[in-house]
């Protein structure tokens, strides 16, 4: 079954907008099982709830916009819609077949998908890397083609140098891009990342942490697990508020209490002489 349908401007509107067919393009209805996803598209994670919402809409209203595929029936644009149709158990869907070879299809699919606003940082970064390595794009050419700043593209490309564990934390929003940029090409990036998470450091604190890492404030553990421990470097001056706090706490608990105030956190220590004093501390804490 073949029919004409005028829905828009075609692939000339590829960058930054939804791709719609022009008057001369032919919309075909084909079996959904013949269509293949594009393994090189940057988006790797599809939220089930959003796909389900789209599937429900398709069940109620039909698929209003055709999927664009190449001669091999590989998706160029529209994988979310294809997945939603599969979920909705739609058997046949409208498509537009573009006369692209494999290389052209791959490039167009990458460019189109990178323009999406809902890609994760690392999905976008990997898409940039693939275009640079396989299609001879430069940072300048990518910036011009995608309408993004050169600094944005250069910064994201550098994220590909991070260890996989940190890339995963970026994708899961455990670390921000600001945190991750501080760790690029650092010998102890993974250990510092764990420290950032465990101590809930902001980006400015992370920058300070990275600057101080090799200045005897941090050291390897004596065991062989390559864990990095934080050495507490005390501030030269303990302000009056902390001194008053130490005195007040010592008086309240009737024991010696000290505070080690470090540049990135600190320690509050209760000193007891025997188990009876420990029991007394615990009872007052309760």
From Swiss-Prot:
GO molecular function, one term: DNA binding
Keywords, comma-separated and alphabetical: Chromosome partition, DNA-binding
Superkingdom assignment: Bacteria
GO biological process, one term: chromosome segregation
Entries under Pfam families matching the protein: HTH_ParB, ParB_dimer, ParBc
Cellular component GO terms held in the UniProt record: chromosome
Similarity comment text for this entry: Belongs to the ParB family.
Summary of the function given for this chain in its UniProt record: Involved in chromosome partition. Localize to both poles of the predivisional cell following completion of DNA replication. Binds to the DNA origin of replication.
Matches recorded under PANTHER family: CHROMOSOME-PARTITIONING PROTEIN PARB-RELATED
Protein name, per record: Probable chromosome-partitioning protein ParB
Organism expressing this protein natively: Rickettsia prowazekii (strain Madrid E)
Highest classification ranks of the organism: Bacteria, Pseudomonadati, Pseudomonadota, Alphaproteobacteria, Rickettsiales
């Amino acid at each position: 079954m073949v029919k004409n349908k005028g829905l828009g401007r075609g692939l000339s509107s590829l960058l930054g907008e939804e791709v719609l067919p022009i008057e001369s393009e032919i919309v075909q209805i084909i079996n959904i099982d013949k269509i293949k996803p594009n393994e090189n598209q940057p988006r790797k994670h599809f939220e089930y709830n959003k796909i389900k919402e789209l599937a429900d809409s398709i069940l109620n209203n039909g698929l209003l916009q055709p999927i664009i595929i190449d001669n091999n029936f590989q998706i160029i644009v529209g994988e979310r819609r294809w997945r939603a149709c599969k979920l909705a158990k739609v058997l046949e869907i409208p498509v537009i077949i573009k006369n692209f070879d494999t290389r052209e299809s791959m490039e167009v699919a990458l460019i189109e998908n990178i323009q999406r606003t809902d890609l994760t940082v690392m999905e976008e970064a990997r898409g940039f890397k693939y275009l640079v390595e396989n299609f001879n794009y430069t940072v300048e050419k990518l910036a011009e083609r995608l309408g993004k700043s050169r600094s944005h593209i250069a910064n994201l490309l550098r994220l590909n140098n991070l260890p996989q564990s940190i890339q995963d934390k970026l994708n899961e929003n455990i670390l921000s891009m600001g945190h991750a940029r501080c760790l690029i090409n650092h010998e102890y990036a993974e250990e510092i990342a764990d420290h950032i998470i465990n101590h809930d450091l902001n980006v400015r604190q992370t920058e300070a942490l990275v600057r101080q890492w090799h200045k005897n404030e941090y050291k390897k553990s004596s065991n062989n697990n390559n864990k990095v421990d934080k050495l507490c470097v005390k501030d030269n001056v303990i302000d009056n508020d902390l001194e008053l706090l130490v005195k007040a706490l010592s008086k309240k608990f009737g024991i010696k209490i000290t505070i080690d105030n470090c540049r990135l956190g600190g320690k509050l220590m209760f000193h007891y002489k025997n188990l009876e004093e420990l029991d007394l501390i615990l009872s007052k804490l309760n």
